[in-house]
């Protein structure tokens, strides 16, 4: 069915991934299993009807999980190492080739820390939840372990299981605690995400059984396989669909505005802060690292899709009158920079994509938390019904302003650094021809210009628009409380810290990004050299395992 032999256009190269460094202590297994085990004990927590005990218990579990991940980083992770660290490998079902294999490198460690950090704050954001609190916090904690597993596991089948594990909690959190259209939003979410994840299973099985013999699904094994180019292209296309739904990539994005439109504040934080990053991480881990030959062909498409994300979502956000949907489309727009960075074949651009995921995780979580806090007071999401609330909520206005400035990439904040790195990486690296780079940079800049327009106009409408007399008369229209200030403050510390001193984060993953881009550039050089010398006047069929001639690549590379 697949071409399993290297073809004449051989751009399939061994991954040359360094050998994993074994863990002295099972940090990552503990960070995965501890919140899952903690969630299983939630039903046994004494409950007086208001869920006070279970709230404190969930916060304890989430904070402890965060401390475990911090311990893993401080005690067992060396940023200067390119390869896998904190590696644990235990045979699970050897006859099926399934191994409990976990580890972390520069691609995964920052996202593991982000996951545990955002989840702890989401538990604090869920403090007012009074409807079925035990079930709510059970799902939050189970989701915590599942999402950490997505970034930590190093086995394709384990990755698929972890990917599926976090779907059910999100579905239930939407379907039970969502808004009026919660059933529709939850069903749409599960259809999109569960349906597309079938491609992960198919690609994983195909790669694990490649070449005959005993199946092996571990990433280190797959990275050193010489997959045929046609095989890589088929796997890459399927995985791009699966991960494109999560990122999300336009036009696979329509589930996200509906999900955000019905979710509660803590679920917003998990969706924007963590869930979308799973798609970007998986594109780097699988598409770019395990399938370099196909990545050389698909990278220009990723860049074009990134530009479409940026412009389309920014324009759509500008037209939205619903506050949640406006911020949801803003998230889609910002994730377009991740696609451009991944497709740039530039160390600086790819590093910018990684930083953009971290930055957006923090900024997106802060904005959506503020959306939830504002809705709790106004009981409306329509911008034309919120006018003048700045008179009674001055601290809330200040928090909104700072977080919005972070989202529009104000210098001194993390979003500015990440977007600047993506632009600089694309423009300065000569992998692509100069006209292509200029056109892409110019189009992406349109989105950068639109962002402050729709965000600042949003602030004006909420806080200084035409006064809604009935709304202003409500006594529950109170200013930000200490818990809310603490949550936003906790998110702003890394946002501003990274913006002022980016190396505190970029040094965590620079070595891994350098190795990844070096292997991908070797692949693209073979595309350029071979296509220019042998295939410049031919139409090459992908079905024959050969790559098409792409004249957007610079011949100097």
From Swiss-Prot:
Membrane topology listed for this record: Multi-pass membrane protein
Pfam families from the UniProt entry: Proton_antipo_M
Compartments reported by the entry: Cellular thylakoid membrane
GO MF: NADH dehydrogenase (ubiquinone) activity; ubiquinone binding
Domain of life: Bacteria
Keyword NAD: yes
Swiss-Prot/TrEMBL catalytic activity: a plastoquinone + NADH + (n+1) H(+)(in) = a plastoquinol + NAD(+) + n H(+)(out); a plastoquinone + NADPH + (n+1) H(+)(in) = a plastoquinol + NADP(+) + n H(+)(out)
Secreted found in the keyword field: no
Keyword tags: Membrane, NAD, NADP, Plastoquinone, Quinone, Thylakoid, Translocase, Transmembrane, Transmembrane helix
EC number from the UniProt entry: 7.1.1.-
Regions crossing the membrane: 25-45, 57-77, 111-131, 133-153, 157-177, 189-209, 230-250, 264-284, 298-318, 327-347, 353-373, 397-417, 438-458, 485-505
InterPro entries tied to this protein: NADH_Q_OxRdtase_chain4, NADH_Q_OxRdtase_chainM/4, NADH_UbQ_OxRdtase, ND/Mrp_TM
GO CC, alphabetical: plasma membrane-derived thylakoid membrane
A GO BP entry: electron transport coupled proton transport
Function, as annotated: NDH-1 shuttles electrons from NAD(P)H, via FMN and iron-sulfur (Fe-S) centers, to quinones in the respiratory chain. The immediate electron acceptor for the enzyme in this species is believed to be plastoquinone. Couples the redox reaction to proton translocation (for every two electrons transferred, four hydrogen ions are translocated across the cytoplasmic membrane), and thus conserves the redox energy in a proton gradient.
Family to which this protein belongs: Belongs to the complex I subunit 4 family.
HAMAP family: NDH1_NuoM (MF_00491)
UniProt protein name: NAD(P)H-quinone oxidoreductase chain 4
């Amino acid at each position: 069915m697949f071409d399993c032999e290297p073809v004449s256009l051989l751009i399939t190269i061994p991954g040359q991934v360094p050998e994993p460094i074994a863990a002295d202590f099972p940090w990552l297994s503990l960070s995965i299993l501890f919140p899952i085990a903690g969630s299983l004990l939630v039903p046994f927590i004494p409950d007086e009807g208001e869920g006070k005990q279970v709230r404190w218990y969930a916060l304890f579990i989430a904070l402890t999980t965060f401390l475990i991940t911090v311990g893993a980083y401080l005690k067992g992770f060396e940023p200067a190492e390119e390869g896998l660290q904190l590696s644990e490998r235990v045979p699970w079902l050897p006859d099926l080739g399934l191994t409990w294999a976990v580890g972390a490198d520069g691609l995964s460690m920052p996202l593991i820390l982000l996951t545990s950090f955002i989840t702890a704050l989401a538990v604090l954001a869920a403090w007012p939840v009074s409807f079925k609190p035990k079930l709510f916090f059970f799902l939050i904690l189970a989701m915590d372990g599942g999402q950490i597993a997505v970034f930590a596991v190093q086995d394709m089948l384990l990755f698929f299981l972890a990917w599926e594990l976090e779907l059910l909690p999100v579905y239930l959190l939407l379907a039970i605690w969502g808004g009026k259209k919660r059933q529709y939003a939850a069903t749409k979410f599960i259809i999109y995400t569960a349906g597309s994840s079938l491609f992960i299973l198919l690609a994983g099985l195909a790669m694990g059984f490649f070449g005959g013999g005993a199946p092996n699904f571990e990433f280190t094994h797959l990275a050193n396989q010489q997959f045929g180019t046609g095989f890589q292209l088929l796997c890459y296309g399927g995985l791009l669909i699966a991960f494109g739904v999560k990122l999300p990539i336009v036009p696979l994005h329509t589930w996200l505005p509906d999900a955000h439109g019905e979710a509660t504040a803590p679920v917003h934080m998990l969706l924007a802060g963590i869930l979308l990053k799973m798609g970007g991480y998986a594109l780097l881990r699988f598409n770019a690292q395990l399938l370099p030959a196909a990545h050389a062909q698909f990278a220009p498409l990723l860049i074009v899709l990134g530009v479409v994300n940026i412009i389309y979502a920014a324009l759509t956000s500008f037209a939205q009158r619903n506050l949640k949907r406006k911020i949801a489309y803003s998230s889609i727009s910002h994730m377009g920079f991740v696609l451009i960075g991944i497709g740039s074949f530039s160390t600086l651009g790819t590093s910018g994509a990684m930083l953009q995921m971290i930055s957006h995780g923090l900024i997106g979580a802060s904005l959506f938390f503020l959306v939830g806090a504002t809705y709790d007071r106004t009981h409306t999401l329509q911008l034309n019904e919120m006018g003048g609330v700045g008179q009674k909520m001055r601290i809330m206005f200040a928090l909104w302003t700072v977080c919005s400035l972070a989202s529009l990439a104000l210098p001194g904040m993390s979003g500015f650094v990440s977007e600047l790195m993506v632009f600089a990486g694309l423009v300065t690296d000569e992998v692509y021809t100069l006209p292509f780079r200029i056109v892409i940079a110019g189009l992406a800049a349109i989105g950068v210009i639109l962002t402050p327009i729709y965000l600042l106009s949003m602030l004006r409408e909420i806080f200084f628009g035409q006064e809604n007399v009935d709304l202003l008369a409500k006594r529950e229209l109170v200013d930000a409380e200490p818990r809310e200030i603490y949550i936003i403050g906790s998110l702003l510390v890394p946002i501003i810290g990274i913006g002022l001193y980016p190396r505190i984060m970029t040094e965590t993953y620079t070595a891994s990004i350098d190795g990844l881009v070096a292997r991908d550039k070797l692949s693209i050089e073979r595309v350029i050299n071979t296509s220019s010398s042998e295939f410049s006047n031919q139409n090459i069929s992908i079905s024959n395992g050969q790559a098409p001639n792409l004249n957007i690549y610079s011949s100097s590379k």
